[in-house]
Amino acid sequence: WVAYNIFCPICGNAHISNLPNNMPVSDFKCDVCGAIYELKSKKGRIGNKIVAGAYATMMERITSENSPDLFLMEYSDDLQVLNLILVPRYFFVPAIIEKRKPLSETAHRAGWTGCNILYSEIPEQGKITIIKDQILADQQLVMEKYAKAKELQTGSLESRGWLLDVLSCVNAIPTTDFSLQEMYQYKDILQAKHKDNHNIEAKIRQKLQILRKKGFIQFLGRGQYRKI
């Protein structure tokens, strides 16, 4: 269905192609820009967690430069596509991967350890709507959102994790305008995620500056910011 009905969110090519079934964590490819996509589908709502494959494979994947972008599909009892979300690969960091308990010794694959993707932990900027309530989104808007999301790409996985965590804190503030002092209120949450860092406030300021340079927020002066 995806190959026949969905355009490439990166370059706008009208269709993407199926890949052979034996390709690990890869289901589709754009023949124009070469982008690789994985599809996970679920009847009903996605919820807060997405069941994924082997934990070790997932951790290798998010550290790879060739990891695929992820399509998440919700479908109805009669197999109608309800919603389709794209999560760009730049939003995958270790913090959103939950390790499951190994299978018991009596299981067919004893000791195998799977994982979950913590969907609720992904910032909203990393959930690009392609279909909502069976209505296809504007192609140009989808491409623009992907291009902006790509700005969050960093060479360091640790740096990316920090950037996404601070962005999530920005998103959690209900108002469009916010202050540095409001951001400091999330200090304990960030400290719990980054236990080895002992200068959280400085890190918040640093990541806010990066988010400003990348066009996600605007600095208004005197410790005041505005979401863009």
Positions of the model-derived regions?
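Short cysteine-rich clusters marking metal-coordination/redox-active sites
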Residues: 8-11, 30-33
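Long, low-complexity, charged/polar intrinsically disordered regions in eukaryotic proteins
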Residues: 86-165
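Short, positively charged loop/turn segments that connect secondary-structure elements
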Residues: 188-204
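A short acidic, leucine-rich amphipathic alpha-helix
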Residues: 182-186
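Positively charged, polyanion-binding regions of nucleic-acid-associated proteins
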Residues: 157-177, 209
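Charged low-complexity interaction tracts in eukaryotic proteins
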Residues: 202-228
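Residues immediately within or flanking Cys/His clusters that coordinate Zn2+
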Residues: 5, 25-27
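Short metal-binding segments enriched for Cys and/or His
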Residues: 34-68
